[in-house]
Amino acid sequence: MFDTLLDPLIDASHKGFPHASAALRLSQIGAQGWNVLRGDLPLPLAVIRQDRLQHNLAWMQQFAQSRGLGLAPHGKTSMSPQLFRRQLDAGAWGM
Protein backbone atom coordinates (compact mmCIF):
# COMPACT_ATOMS: atom_id res chain seq x y z
CA MET A 1 0.00 0.00 0.00
CA PHE A 2 2.82 2.43 0.80
CA ASP A 3 4.20 2.02 -2.76
CA THR A 4 0.82 3.20 -4.06
CA LEU A 5 1.18 6.32 -1.90
CA LEU A 6 4.67 6.98 -3.27
CA ASP A 7 3.72 6.42 -6.92
CA PRO A 8 0.00 7.22 -7.18
CA LEU A 9 -2.06 7.45 -10.32
CA ILE A 10 -2.45 11.15 -11.20
CA ASP A 11 -5.15 12.50 -13.51
CA ALA A 12 -6.99 15.71 -14.39
CA SER A 13 -8.75 15.70 -11.02
CA HIS A 14 -5.39 16.64 -9.45
CA LYS A 15 -4.37 20.28 -9.32
CA GLY A 16 -1.66 21.11 -11.83
CA PHE A 17 -2.29 18.13 -14.13
CA PRO A 18 -3.10 18.89 -17.81
CA HIS A 19 -6.82 18.35 -18.39
CA ALA A 20 -6.40 16.71 -21.81
CA SER A 21 -3.77 14.17 -20.68
CA ALA A 22 -4.41 10.54 -19.84
CA ALA A 23 -3.83 9.41 -16.25
CA LEU A 24 -0.21 8.63 -15.36
CA ARG A 25 1.75 7.28 -12.42
CA LEU A 26 3.65 10.01 -10.59
CA SER A 27 6.92 8.36 -11.66
CA GLN A 28 5.96 8.80 -15.34
CA ILE A 29 5.35 12.55 -15.26
CA GLY A 30 8.98 13.61 -15.76
CA ALA A 31 9.17 11.71 -19.05
CA GLN A 32 6.26 13.68 -20.57
CA GLY A 33 8.42 16.65 -21.54
CA TRP A 34 5.94 19.17 -20.16
CA ASN A 35 7.24 22.71 -19.78
CA VAL A 36 5.79 25.24 -17.34
CA LEU A 37 7.01 28.21 -19.39
CA ARG A 38 5.45 26.82 -22.57
CA GLY A 39 2.06 26.64 -20.85
CA ASP A 40 1.85 22.84 -20.87
CA LEU A 41 0.56 22.75 -17.29
CA PRO A 42 -2.36 24.57 -15.67
CA LEU A 43 -1.59 27.11 -12.98
CA PRO A 44 -1.10 27.44 -10.08
CA LEU A 45 1.52 24.75 -9.53
CA ALA A 46 4.74 24.26 -7.60
CA VAL A 47 8.08 23.30 -9.10
CA ILE A 48 10.48 21.53 -6.75
CA ARG A 49 14.10 21.19 -7.84
CA GLN A 50 15.51 17.85 -6.73
CA ASP A 51 18.99 19.25 -6.01
CA ARG A 52 17.61 21.97 -3.75
CA LEU A 53 15.21 19.63 -2.02
CA GLN A 54 18.05 17.19 -1.28
CA HIS A 55 20.25 20.05 0.00
CA ASN A 56 17.47 21.35 2.28
CA LEU A 57 16.71 17.87 3.65
CA ALA A 58 20.38 17.25 4.46
CA TRP A 59 20.92 20.76 5.87
CA MET A 60 17.91 20.61 8.19
CA GLN A 61 18.82 17.14 9.45
CA GLN A 62 22.44 18.23 10.11
CA PHE A 63 21.23 21.41 11.83
CA ALA A 64 19.01 19.43 14.20
CA GLN A 65 21.61 16.73 14.89
CA SER A 66 24.38 19.26 15.58
CA ARG A 67 22.20 20.67 18.36
CA GLY A 68 21.29 17.30 19.81
CA LEU A 69 17.74 17.47 18.49
CA GLY A 70 15.55 14.93 16.75
CA LEU A 71 13.54 16.08 13.77
CA ALA A 72 9.83 15.28 13.42
CA PRO A 73 8.47 17.46 10.58
CA HIS A 74 4.81 18.47 10.45
CA GLY A 75 3.51 16.32 7.59
CA LYS A 76 0.28 18.23 7.12
CA THR A 77 2.26 21.21 5.83
CA SER A 78 3.25 19.50 2.58
CA MET A 79 0.51 16.82 2.49
CA SER A 80 2.95 14.76 0.39
CA PRO A 81 3.73 11.12 1.22
CA GLN A 82 6.70 11.38 -1.15
CA LEU A 83 8.19 14.20 0.93
CA PHE A 84 7.37 12.33 4.16
CA ARG A 85 9.42 9.37 2.89
CA ARG A 86 12.35 11.60 1.88
CA GLN A 87 12.35 13.28 5.31
CA LEU A 88 12.24 9.95 7.14
CA ASP A 89 15.01 8.55 4.91
CA ALA A 90 17.11 11.65 5.72
CA GLY A 91 16.87 10.85 9.43
CA ALA A 92 13.66 12.34 10.82
CA TRP A 93 12.46 10.17 13.72
CA GLY A 94 8.77 10.75 13.10
CA MET A 95 6.20 12.60 11.11
Residue ranges, per PLM feature:
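A charged N-terminal "starter" segment
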Residues: 1-95
